[in-house]
Amino acid sequence: MKIRIDIPHHPYDIQIEKGCMAQAGQWLRELWQPQKVVIVTDNHVASLYAEKVKLSLEDAGFQVAVFDFLEGEERKNLTTVQKVYEFLVKQGLTRSDGIVALGGGVVGDLAGFVASTYMRGIHFVQIPTSLTAQVDSSIGGKTGVNTPFAKNMVGTFAQPDGVLIDPLVLETLGKRELIEGMGEVIKYGLIEDPELWALLTGLNGSVESILEHAETLIXHSCQVKRKMVVEDELDNGIRLYLNFGHTIGHAIEATAGYGKVMHGEAVAMGMVQISKIAEEKGLMPAGITQSITEMCQKFGLPVDYENWEVDKLYQALTHDKKARGNTLKLVLVPELGSATIHPVSLEEMKDYLVK
């Protein structure tokens, strides 16, 4: 299956196909002329797939080097970026060469940021290996790294030349790593896709059910992401809907310490908390919080953060990238399959942190 991201200045395709990683070289050869390529990955993904992808690219005529770093959200920072820059220089990469981001969201965000800033920008592609990356972070051109102040505080908008998604690689994920990706999938059903929500309702929540329906779940999610990215590439309007649950979710990630709470887990807890208060305020329909809670719990996602400290979470919220002056653009779901922007003051945002 191919999904076209038809952005006028930089259109590209998402290819979703079981087993397609084995043809990575052929796929990339259709996008780029033979040239130097650096695969950026983490040590865990490298042990599983780096050699396989490297050989496929070399068979297609590319000169390939591999840079890997220790896995984990806590490594998504400017220190790691500097190390990648140094490696690219040593490999002699020029503006006519490219980067292959092979890994989950941390790898994709960091490698995309490096590609968009090295020599003012070189080509890159995404080969995502986690469910979160396959349904969300590899698509749409947001890149970034964390700072001690906030998640993804330093970043760019830079579209890849293509995204290659192999659902079979999800079979090598640990249970927690697979399940956390369902936080984003559930979000897509809530904000835009009632058909996806119905599909999720029919699943029993097991790892086996996720893997069995992975290709369909990924396709639905990518279609929602495609629509919002094409209409609003730079995140000024409809694309903000994708941030449902993320305002509080990012604050949870930051206060917990990067890597302690996984992104999809934080999104799940954020969606439940936002919905609970919005429902109490009459801004979301009665019963929707219970529906979201039950859906998250069915797939094994957490719905409550045990280290809830309002002051720390509020401090993290003040660094939210969606803030404009003293106003936050909060995303709510007034009905299943529909989202809206609800501007709130930073002061009012404290209401949404009350347990």
UniProtKB/Swiss-Prot annotation:
Q: What is a biological process (GO) this protein takes part in?
A: amino acid biosynthetic process
Q: Which UniProt keywords apply?
A: Amino-acid biosynthesis, Aromatic amino acid biosynthesis, Cobalt, Cytoplasm, Lyase, Metal-binding, NAD, Nucleotide-binding, Zinc
Co-factor binding details: Binds 1 divalent metal cation per subunit. Can use either Co(2+) or Zn(2+).
Cofactor(s) essential for the protein? Co(2+); Zn(2+); NAD(+)
Residues noted as binding NAD(+) in the record, renumbered to the chain: 71-76, 105-109, 129-130, 142, 151
Pathway(s) served: Metabolic intermediate biosynthesis; chorismate biosynthesis; chorismate from D-erythrose 4-phosphate and phosphoenolpyruvate: step 2/7
Keyword Lyase belongs to the record: yes
| Keyword Membrane applies | no
Give the EC number(s) listed in the UniProt record: 4.2.3.4
What's a single GO CC term here? cytoplasm
Where does the UniProt annotation place the signal sequence? none
Gene Ontology MF terms in the entry: 3-dehydroquinate synthase activity; metal ion binding; nucleotide binding
Identify the residues that bind Zn(2+).
E184, H246, H263
Q: Which Pfam families match?
A: DHQ_synthase, DHQS_C
Q: From the UniProt record, list the reaction(s) this protein catalyses.
A: 7-phospho-2-dehydro-3-deoxy-D-arabino-heptonate = 3-dehydroquinate + phosphate
The superkingdom of the source organism is: Bacteria
Where mainly found? cytoplasm
Name where it's found.
Cytoplasm
PANTHER family given for it?
A: 3-DEHYDROQUINATE SYNTHASE, 3-DEHYDROQUINATE SYNTHASE, CHLOROPLASTIC
Explain the purpose of this protein: Catalyzes the conversion of 3-deoxy-D-arabino-heptulosonate 7-phosphate (DAHP) to dehydroquinate (DHQ).
Q: Name the NCBIfam families for this protein.
A: aroB (TIGR01357)
Q: Which family does it belong to?
A: Belongs to the sugar phosphate cyclases superfamily. Dehydroquinate synthase family.
- Please report the name of this protein according to its UniProt entry: 3-dehydroquinate synthase
Q: What is the lineage of its organism?
A: Bacteria, Bacillati, Bacillota, Bacilli, Lactobacillales
Which gene is the coding source of this polypeptide chain?
Answer: aroB
